[in-house]
Each structure stands twice: as C-alpha cells, then as structure tokens.
Regions:
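Short terminal alpha-helical segments
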Residues: 1-40
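Amphipathic alpha-helical elements of HEAT/ARM-like alpha-solenoid repeat scaffolds that form extended
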Residues: 7-14, 50-57, 109-110, 128-131
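Short, solvent-exposed segments of well-ordered alpha helices
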Residues: 9, 40-47, 77, 81
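Hydrophobic/aromatic-lined pockets within catalytic cores
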Residues: 15, 19, 58-61, 135
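Hydrophobic core segments within long, regular secondary-structure runs in both alpha-
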Residues: 22-33, 54, 83-95, 124, ...
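Short, well-structured hydrophobic secondary-structure segments
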Residues: 25-64
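Amphipathic protein-protein interaction modules
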Residues: 52-114
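Low-complexity intrinsically disordered segments
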Residues: 90-144
Length: 144
C-alpha cells in the first residue's frame, strides 16, 4: 500500500483486466457510476480503480510516462474509446474519490485522511494531478 496510483491490489487487478481487454475501461466506468448512483458512496476498490483508469487515460494521450506495471496495455485502443462523455464521467468520479464536495462519499479518501499526514498530502497531490490532467485532455481534445 503506497501513495502512487498502482501501489494497491485493486489498481493492479484493474490493470490486469485492462491488459486482457482495453475496452474494459469503459465497462468499469459504467459499473462504478451505477454503484455511485445506487449507494451514493464509493468503496476503496472502486476508488482505486478510478485513479488507475485516470492514469491509463493520461498514458494513452502521452501525458504521463507509462508505469512498468502497465507496459503490456494497448494504449491505442484506450485512446480510441475515450470520448467527451467518458472524460466528463471520469472527472465526476475523480472528484468524488477526492471528496471535492466534502460530502464524505469516498472510502479511499477517508482511509488516506486517517493515514500519516505526509502520506495523505502526497496521495492528494498525485491524485489531484490526475484530475487536472484529465480536465486538460478534455479541454484540449474536445474544445469547440
């Protein structure tokens, strides 16, 4: 368990699923959105998957260097599946994971909040960088 995106089992499991089928990224986004709509809360596993998803999208657009664990993924297919709607939904989920609205609907955020303050700050910085990166891709790729 660590502060970077892929230093947890949930993100690693997500990576393996995407390796087998890059389009699973869209299915996972839909599944997580349905959970949020039903429960108005995001468990730690889904929160970790959202962060991993954001990292993979950034990788597919060449924004971040590809982490060793994700070297086998076909990023071309991921990039082809990313549309404006996908990015907007991903942004909403990232904001929920990061508790932007202060509504305490993210187990992952709560766990990091209880961690060592230095680790929490590092995790937040990494995670907010993902959010900003996704917003930038949306704005650059889908500007009117």
């Amino acid at each position: 368990w660590g502060t970077s995106v892929f230093e947890n089992d949930s993100a690693c499991d997500f990576i393996l699923n995407v390796e087998n089928s890059p389009t699973v990224i869209t299915d996972e986004l839909v599944r997580i959105r349905e959970i949020v709509e039903e429960e108005d809360y995001l468990e730690v596993d889904e929160g970790s998957s959202v962060l991993a998803m954001a990292e993979l999208v950034l990788n597919s657009f060449g924004v971040n260097p590809i982490h060793e664990i994700a070297k086998k993924i076909d990023f071309t297919l991921i990039k082809e599946t990313v549309a404006l709607t996908f990015l907007n939904q991903l942004i909403s989920l990232l904001e929920l994971v990061l508790d932007v609205d202060n509504n305490n609907r993210s187990e992952l955020f709560e766990l990091w909040e209880e961690a060592d303050p230095k680790d929490f700050a590092e995790w937040k910085n990494i995670s907010f960088d993902l959010l900003e990166g996704i917003k930038k891709i949306r704005d650059e790729q889908f500007a009117n």
